[in-house]
Amino acid sequence: NQIQQVLMPYEGHPQQHRVFNSVKQLDKKIKTIGYMHTVLPCLPTDYIRREGFPEKILVNGQNQKKILNSFLGWDNSQVEAITSLRYTEQNKKNFQKQIFFPYYINNEKKIFKYFKNLILNSKPGHLPNLKVRNHPAMKYSKKHLNLKYLVETFLEKNKNRFSNNELNQNISIFIGSTASVIEALERGINAIHICENTIFDLYHTQLWESILVNEVTTNVFSYKLKEFGKCITIGKNNISFDNLTL
């Protein structure tokens, strides 16, 4: 049977462009489709349209489609916003009352300084009792383990500043460059974002028009959504590629 289309995950990586190029060299009639299974990063330069790009990409939110169309060189017809196949009503994480570490940390002492400043400038009882959640791929990283020690030691010494109540059950803290904060917002979490570098880490309103951003302290920001379902359209439990017209 003749191949009509090639569909593969797409994160803007060079090797993915090479695959799409190779497919077109074999047969120009084959349609190439990239599926963005995650969320665009804070600074989405990897997704600038360039040689080897797929003919069409599927994204899981209207806000992401607009970013690609308005800022990254993609034509409107080349980007389709679909209901997420990854972020579903059933497949959801526990985001409540946690401190999420990113994959990459440059300077853990700098991050800890921003974290400590946030806590000391918050009203006692405003934040819930928090637990550290390290990135699963970084459980042996010296920087991550050092930051974990600093944060947990500080939390223990200042435990009287934290209290669980009905108003703060959905508060969590996210550190560095992470897409998890977007999923958390779409699932009703009040997200606080500690940015090691605001250029690379912050979700700017200039790109993410459906997010309200408020600076809390230096390099620390709180997010709220203007409207749910714009950054990510959470999928139903039974959706698959079979439900899509590609």
Task: Give the ranges of each region predicted by the language model.
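Active-site and donor-binding regions of nucleotide-sugar-utilizing enzymes
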Residues: N1-T83, A179-V181
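Short, aromatic/basic amphipathic alpha-helical patches
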Residues: R18-K24, S70-L72, N117-N121, S141-L155, ...
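Short, charged/polar "capping" segments at the starts of alpha-helices
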Residues: Q15-H17, C42-P44, Q64-L68, E89-Q90, ...
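Structural motif
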Residues: M8-G12, M36-H37, V59-Q62, F101-N107, ...
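Conserved catalytic-core segment of nucleotide-activated headgroup transferases in glycan assembly
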Residues: W74-L150
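Anion (oxyanion) recognition and catalysis
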Residues: K24-L26, K123-P124, L185
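Catalytic binding pocket for nucleotide-activated donors in carbohydrate/polymer assembly enzymes
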Residues: P54, L72-A81, K148-Y149, N170-I171, ...
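Short acidic low-complexity segments
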Residues: E156-N168, N219
